[in-house]
């Protein structure tokens, strides 16, 4: 299923953001890993959550940028928690979808 979804996106050297409904943390990480390993984005962020509650679980993945630093920066701006390795970070943001997208775009600008 995730392979089909990943196939919908072309290879890209730009950041990729994906919001999906109803995924658990394992699925979020799997989809993020698949997308960044297939070079669908320079940095990939997959989120799943609830706009009404203002909470999104996330995974960030990249082989080109340190995900620990990105996660820390985004957590600070989005009332988030989480961490990880240089290749992948995961956690939860307490913010609106638009805020998450805006901060991701700001933090991944070249």
Task: Locate the predicted segments by residue.
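Glycine-rich, acidic loop segments that terminate in or are immediately followed by a histidine
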Residues: 14-110
